[in-house]
């Protein structure tokens, strides 16, 4: 997800953590104190299975677009939260907060506040980075991870995005390249050209549902620009050299990689992450893009449900 008023979905776009609360997690909405501020959360469902906590993408694209995953709440609590600086979580005027380490501590604070002793993680786009980094220091009680449209190697991400840019009509591609060269990415022409890219590789469902529109409208620009950069194709922020591949071999919990057939997280790149992860599964969803749950909820949600059930069984869960 990238910068832009229309918003962007790039390294880029969410993570979900599912967990089991000490005294049970009841449906509720509230705010949680985290390092640097407060974050909004909503827990839905009251099923008996291990809860699911969702880590959205961006960085800075709030959790609205993950709404289809609420359908899993008939079996387990599902927890949505907007990371600090976007959506319903107020943005402090301090860009020094936008670091991987602080977001890991934020996730730890959310999990502690909600009493999630056992959890399944679901991360999408940037959320997969957050999930992976969280596992380095807080692996206890994490029972599985869904890596949705992962952005685990940012140099590869840029190469893949550039290859997709060259599939656009020349008239569209040249507008994008000219605006990025001149640093005029707020221009209406650039926004219109990028929307063509989004409709192909971010979300193919037309028209965009209200929740997806809200996610883009309420993007945290400071978070996105500081960590990512100006666009889907130019990563100049603090994530620019991120590569988490070396840690994938250390993962010992069940892992499912997902992506859309037309995802900006290219299926061949996602497959390389799956191959580097012991025992990992992978599923590609036909005719879907980066926001796979929005593009094909009828197929996607049952696939996530089935994976979580398998993970529960492996961990001796219900």
Give the location of each predicted region:
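Conserved HGGG/HGGXW glycine-rich cap/lid loop of the alpha/beta-hydrolase fold
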Residues: 37-91
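Active-site loop/oxyanion-hole signature of alpha/beta-hydrolase fold enzymes
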Residues: 83-126
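Conserved hydrolase catalytic core segment
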Residues: 117-163
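Helix-rich cap/lid subdomain of alpha/beta-hydrolase
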Residues: 155-219
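Hydrophobic, aromatic-rich cap/lid helix
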Residues: 213-244
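Short beta-strand/loop motif that positions the catalytic acidic residue
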Residues: 251, 257-259
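Conserved alpha/beta-hydrolase "acid-adjacent" motif
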Residues: 264-269
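Catalytic active-site module of serine/aspartate enzymes centered on a nucleophile-bearing elbow/loop
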Residues: 279-318
